[in-house]
Structures are given as structure tokens and as C-alpha cells.
Amino acid sequence: MGKRETVTCHDHVSFVRRRSTLVLSLLAALLLSLLPWSGTAVAHGSVVDPATRNYGCWLRWGSNHLDPSMAQQDPMCWQAWQADPNGMWNWNGLYRNGSGGNFPAAVPDGQLCSGGRTEGGRYNSLDAAGAWKTTDINSDFTVKLYDQASHGADYFLVYVTRQGFDPTTQPLRWSDLQLVARTGRYAPSQNYSIPVSTSGYSGRHIVYTVWQASHMDQTYFLCSDVNFR
């Protein structure tokens, strides 16, 4: 007869511990796989068309943001990714709380695209003047906003930079903006469309959208680079 192997109490306890560790590891991996993309802890929203600066950078380079060719192909996005990648991963979190409707006080000149250097400076690179990629639009266009959290809106304000302003060399100031649309309330949803009619604009401009959310005093400040055809 073969030698009979004796299983001790210590062996049994070790087996149970190993199995428990394996189960916990598998559960942890499953939970990590369910988390959203890196850096985005809370869903909010942004203008997706014409794409905001950081949304456009995430859209074009989010799957390959370490590609060195970006430095030549898309230099403004390159400097933004180098400054703080979380500004792109969190493309839907560019807001300030408690502005009380006094936006120039909360967001000084030269800091409009970062929402007054909100979120500890995460979005500061978006204030840089330069040749940001543009979206071609006509004099009549639609601003499309994605509100993942369905906050709703008390109102939207849509501005276009004055003719003659050069976003490739000039920091954006409130005095550079011309109001082209003001809306009423929007019920909570995930997708909003804001029709805009303009005249007299040509070439490169910034469309600046202010979104006053309804769920609290939370305001989004969003720069989209466009080319009027």
C-alpha cells in the first residue's frame, strides 16, 4: 500500500487563507475594472461641440497621450497634457462653486478658460494663448452640451470673441467677449442644444460658454476654439 498523506490542521488553515486571499484579489480586480477612466471621480459635463479645449485634447489623444508626435501635430494639447493630464481626464469637471453670478470677480481676465484657475490649478494650461485645434462653424451654429450628471441649467450664456481678437497670441479677457445667446432654464437631462445666430464673424475665434447649473450654485466656464467659415 502507498504511504497515506496526513493533512494537519495547520495545512487546512493555510489552504483556507490562500483561498481567501485569492478571492479578495479577484474581487479587488473586478471593482477596479468597474471604475471610470483615471482621474474622473464624479461625473459632471461640458460642451462637446464645438469641442472645448480639454475635451478636444482628450478626444484626440486620450488613448495615446504619451505619443511624442503630439508635440508637433497638436502642440497646445501637448503642453496641456504635460502640465496636468488630469485636466483632460477630468474634461467634465471645469467648474466653480459659489460664484453668485459675479463671474468677472470669480474668474479674472486671463483665466477665463481655466475657470479662474479652479480645482487647484488643474486647468491652468487651458488659458495659454496659441494655435489650439479649431472646429469649423457657420454664422448659425449649435452649441451641444453633455450633462452626464443631469444637473439641469438655470441658464446658458454663449459668447464669441470680438472680430480682431487673436486667440493665438492674446489671453482672453471679459472685454473681448460679445454675448450672442442667453437661454432660460433647461430641465435636467444629459444632452442640451443651444441654437446660436451670429453675423460679422470670420476666421479664428473662441466660443465661450457659461453654464449655470440648477442643482446648486455651480458654474462651468468653457472655451471652444472655432473657425468661422
Segments the model singles out, each with a brief description of its role:
Residues 1-17:
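N-terminal secretory signal peptides that target proteins for export/translocation
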Residues 18-30:
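Sec-dependent N-terminal signal peptides
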Residues 149, 164-165, 198-203, 229:
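A short, structured loop/turn motif at beta-sheet edges
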Residues 217-229:
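Short beta-strand elements
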Residues 42-151, 155-171:
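N-terminal "mature-chain" segments and other terminal, solvent-exposed stretches
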Residues 170-197:
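Extracellular carbohydrate recognition and processing domains
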